Amino acid sequence: MIRYTSLIMLGLLASSFYCLQTALAQTPLSPRAERGQTFARANCAHCHSIDKVSPSPLAIAPPFRTLHQRYPVEMLEEALAEGIVTGHANMPEFRLEPDQIGNLIAFLKTLER
């Protein structure tokens, strides 16, 4: 019985440590990145994963956390201003305002960490 209780306590301690480590690792977003996250949630999350772990709802839409592996996210600025037309097949064409672009880029950079 003591061994069983010890195992339970060890499990609880390990899970508590993991939760604490995860909470400490999450840094708060800057106001600009928060606005970018809000934009992404409203306009992009129907197809793309906009977090660090989830798969994209639409399989052909790359998760935002992997964009920096393809090219520097700063390179998206011009495409976002002129309108992205070469995304995945279901992606609508759109153009963003300069402040929206800066906000979205700031958010995308947080996913690189």
Kindly give the residue locations of the regions a language model identified.
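Extracytoplasmic electron-transfer domains, predominantly the class I c-type cytochrome c fold
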Residues: 63-112
